[in-house]
């Protein structure tokens, strides 16, 4: 009996640009499906930007129909206002798959880097180099889309443990 592929959506939340990446996993095989980003303009009102992120991710969810989703956890920086705005974008990005009945797993940035590159303090160029090896058909047009694919890869590797954590916590 062969198992059918499981489709995963990775999300890299951001107010300016929210990256998304979709891949299928079958056993230990990763297959690139698509990636991109939802962009907003700084001149837009905050509520309009959040709505644009929600609608953009809704279109991605409609088109690709993932079974699982993952998002990067927010890091707190020195700029409290920027951190709050990122948190709002992250909340909207988590809501979109939840409205489709999809549980959203969360991963720390250093866990994503360690999973994809092997080092928790890897930089963006190292992540992009590994993406070319792991997903040769992927051609992300932005760092945010590349990060979203890295988040999806992380979930593919840790999904069993993530499901168990959610079950225990729930």
UniProtKB/Swiss-Prot annotation:
Q: Name one GO molecular function term.
A: DNA binding
Catalysed reaction, written as an equation: Endonucleolytic cleavage at a junction such as a reciprocal single-stranded crossover between two homologous DNA duplexes (Holliday junction)
Q: What is its EC number?
A: 3.1.21.10
Cofactor: how and how many bound: Binds 2 Mg(2+) ion per subunit.
The record's PROSITE patterns line, in alphabetical order, gives:
RUVC (PS01321)
Which InterPro entries does the UniProt entry name for this protein?
RNaseH-like_sf, RNaseH_sf, X-over_junc_endoDNase_Mg_BS, X-over_junc_endoDNase_RuvC
Chief localisation class: cytoplasm
- GO-annotated cellular components: cytoplasm; Holliday junction resolvase complex
What GO biological process terms are annotated to this protein in UniProt? DNA recombination; DNA repair
Question: What cofactor does this chain's UniProt record say it requires?
Answer: Mg(2+)
Supply the Pfam families for this chain: RuvC
Q: Which residues form the active site?
A: 12, 72, 144
KW Cytoplasm (keyword) present: yes
**What are the alphabetically sorted keywords of the record?**
Cytoplasm, DNA damage, DNA recombination, DNA repair, DNA-binding, Endonuclease, Hydrolase, Magnesium, Metal-binding, Nuclease
Positions that bind Mg(2+) 1 = 12, 144
Listed CDD domains? RuvC (cd16962)
Q: Quote the subcellular location field of this record.
A: Cytoplasm
Which residues are listed for Mg(2+) 2 binding in this entry? 72
NCBIfam families assigned: ruvC (TIGR00228)
Functional note: The RuvA-RuvB-RuvC complex processes Holliday junction (HJ) DNA during genetic recombination and DNA repair. Endonuclease that resolves HJ intermediates. Cleaves cruciform DNA by making single-stranded nicks across the HJ at symmetrical positions within the homologous arms, yielding a 5'-phosphate and a 3'-hydroxyl group; requires a central core of homology in the junction. The consensus cleavage sequence is 5'-(A/T)TT(C/G)-3'. Cleavage occurs on the 3'-side of the TT dinucleotide at the point of strand exchange.
- The family this protein is said to belong to: Belongs to the RuvC family.
**Subunit and partners:** Homodimer which binds Holliday junction (HJ) DNA. The HJ becomes 2-fold symmetrical on binding to RuvC with unstacked arms; it has a different conformation from HJ DNA in complex with RuvA. In the full resolvosome a probable DNA-RuvA(4)-RuvB(12)-RuvC(2) complex forms which resolves the HJ.
Report what the protein is called.
Crossover junction endodeoxyribonuclease RuvC
Q: What is the lineage of its organism?
A: Bacteria, Pseudomonadati, Pseudomonadota, Alphaproteobacteria, Hyphomicrobiales
